[in-house]
């Protein structure tokens, strides 16, 4: 009850500065808002009476619940300290400071920055009324505690932990977010967490940042991922990238790619082009070297290792004898007949 009361007081203080911009009943106004009651977000109708306590659902999810930070996923494994201080931020003026001494990682950080900003912009892609201009400045500082200048490589020994602090500057007109990590992967996870602490308030049409945060986080498991079988069901490069985006959002780090099997062989092997020529579902459903490299790089930027699973040539489908009978131990027809006789 005490925590809910503190949340309620913080919300009321935040709302007092925003009432002048709201006119209930205008076209395209949000009809419903939310209140935090017993650690749950309950919907209420926005009226002249409730406008002072109503908050948007994203803001309610940020502040309400048993966890100190409701929108961060997965839940941090270490310290989580927050104060319910919301700051209207201008996402067009966010600045970044990356470790410039690690020159081989700069392109990865630049790509991570662009993805971070695109994630924030996606909150308002479908809104009818554009967000209000203005807001406070946010500076994101990333510190990597390593002097080794090399392209990051994710192994079972990689330290993916990070510490994150967000603090408002004096005067309340800006905030600074500091990430400290021992590897690119930990720093990237910290950047992902910051993106989860910025929500779009569709009632006040502003981006809001939880501006007083301290988080220490590290994954419980070294191998966290999914398996996708594209030998039985072909997925386009675009679809695979969309899957990698989803993995990155929840800090999973492994894409186990089952790329070939008896159903199809969509993998380009330059020394044996007949494999994908006769083994793929169609000429357009082939993963070339360039496409695979593109997916591997796309995953690296997002802190994901791409692990390819290759089935041996004998498990390629029945069209392989047309390509090169010498590469086949037993055809699928003979294999099926053998099992039928057993």
Model regions: which residues?
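Acidic, contiguous N-terminal accessory segments
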Residues: 2-222
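Feature activates predominantly on carbohydrate-active enzymes
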Residues: 156-158, 163-342
